[in-house]
Amino acid sequence: MMNKRIFLSPPFVDRAERAEVDSAFDSGYVAPCGPKVDQFEFELAKLSGRKYAVAVSSATAALELVFAHLKVDKTWIAIVPTLTFIATVSPACRLGAEPWFVDCDSTGNVDLKLLDKALADAAKTGRKILFVAVDLFGRCCNYDTIEKLCRKYKAKFVCDSAEAVGATFNGRPAGSTGLAAVYSFNGNKLITTSGGGAILTDDKKLADHVKKLSQQSREKALWYEHKEIAYNFRMSNLLAAVGLAQLSKMDKILKAKKSVREFYGRCAEGKHLELLPKVEGENNWLTIMLLRNSRERDSLIKFFEAENVETRPVWKPMHLQKVFKGCRVYGGKVSENLFSRGVCLASGAGLTEADFKRIAKVLDDFAAERK
């Protein structure tokens, strides 16, 4: 009989979520908007150190709303780290922007020297510039330097902190940088609302506009009056209830995720296995192991799959995706190397001692065959 599936990063839920959802049902607010959404937004603003938070249906939706507010179109250049999930760049592309990709450094986050070069080249074109930073795998990029570079080249700076809820950079919370930042509450993230996202900002005009855009941009009138084309992206009151329960246990989840990384560190010792270098303040959303080459990467994934343990390669760089063939890229070799060698390991906050033993045995067996 097959062992139970150990998932990559499943939600960490218990009765607290059900109690919050029951409370939302009892209130009669089951549609988008409602007191749970208001409360969730208040807590998110506090968590991120921002003045405003707007809860929406996904981080992808959150980015598109921000870009729509900025009026991103085909006259814009969107500079994006190449090592990321496609949702970082796809909203800007849908609005018509031309994507330029920038390689990462050894941590997986954007290479600052290459970013400087890309921004300088974009500035020479005279076009409007958008830079979308990424806090990759729950590790914040260098907020201070990126803020300076974007000011220098007059680029609009938005931060994709989808993977980094609870992380920090030099004591600053993830999501505290840029004109706006976004969080993800997808089912695999550090905290979840089943599906959802949020926009974090200190700009009241932006916050008010994206909230309006997320609700079909309905005007304040007795009838349905609209002055712009918009979206239906607002978060449900029920999902916000789940989010509130998740926030209440975030410290526990962060502690568990840190323990998972430490476990893998112990497993790697003496086996010539390597983890992606630790970054101060990371939330340890996923632990990444680096193998010698793509053959070993695929072999380790197969070893785990044979024992019903979910793992997967790190993000395939955007400049290698067929949909972006021919797009400008600065560097690329570092992200290509991480993609060819990196495996995202099972990193759930609810892993049991039995789960850890199963995972450790797989790594032992892999290391023994690898020699």
Map each language-model feature to its residues.
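Helix C-cap/helix->beta junction micro-motif
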Residues: 95, 152-153, 307
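Hydrophobic/aromatic ligand-binding patch that stacks against planar heteroaromatic rings
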Residues: 90-92, 149, 238
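N-terminal "arm"/small-domain region of PLP-dependent enzymes with the aminotransferase-like
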Residues: 1-30, 346
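Active-site phosphate-binding strand-loop segment of PLP-dependent enzymes
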Residues: 107-193, 198-200, 205
